[in-house]
């Protein structure tokens, strides 16, 4: 992993310890230039199929082996929903129909050698149409999980916000049924 360099003087920068409120600064030790730790946008898709939700098992760090939803980082100039669809396709080979927004959830992502940085996670809900998921990209496995089993799986979720996302999806699915 390469170092993050100061845009002003080109030296490696350092992250400070979190201040009150969890704020982390990224400051150059040489020229004192301050870079802001802006959140990185991420997009994910909650896919429902006959009372089940699609969960993935992470194949890579961070949190390898834990349960996750299809999703990832938004690319430059990419629409949020398009990013969620792209990640779903890359990680499972699946396509879905109409998607509905589930909202935005904040979290942190750990990058080895650099530390934690904030993420802004946009989720969408869609119904499965056809095909079976084929784990690819950074997914080591894929499983259709009964909505009723999600509570006991919560300790295995990759991210703290996943429980809230799946609760919202479950509530919305029941309201639409």
Predicted features along the sequence, with ranges:
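Nudix hydrolase/Nudix homology domain
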Residues: 1-2, 117, 132-177
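Active-site segment of metal-dependent pyrophosphate-handling enzymes
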Residues: 48, 52, 93-132
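Acidic, metal-coordinating catalytic segment for phosphate/diphosphate chemistry
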Residues: 2-45
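Conserved beta-strand segments that form the floor/walls of ligand-binding pockets within enzyme
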Residues: 8, 27, 54-55, 68, ...
């Amino acid at each position: 992993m390469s170092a993050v360099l100061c845009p002003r003087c080109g030296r490696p920068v350092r992250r400070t310890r979190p201040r009150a409120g969890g704020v982390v600064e990224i400051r150059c030790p040489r020229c004192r230039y301050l870079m802001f730790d802006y959140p990185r946008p991420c997009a994910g898709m909650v896919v429902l199929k006959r009372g089940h939700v699609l969960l993935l098992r992470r194949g890579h760090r961070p949190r390898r082996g834990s349960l996750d939803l299809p999703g990832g980082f938004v690319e430059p100039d990419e629409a949020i929903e398009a990013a969620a669809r792209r990640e779903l396709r890359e990680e499972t080979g699946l396509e879905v129909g109409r998607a509905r927004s589930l909202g935005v959830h904040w979290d942190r992502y750990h990058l080895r050698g650099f530390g934690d940085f904030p993420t802004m996670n946009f989720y969408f809900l869609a119904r499965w149409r056809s095909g079976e998921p084929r784990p690819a990209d950074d997914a080591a496995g894929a499983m259709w999980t009964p909505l009723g089993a999600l509570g006991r799986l919560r300790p295995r979720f990759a991210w703290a916000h996943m429980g809230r996302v799946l609760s919202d999806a479950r509530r919305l699915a029941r309201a639409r049924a």
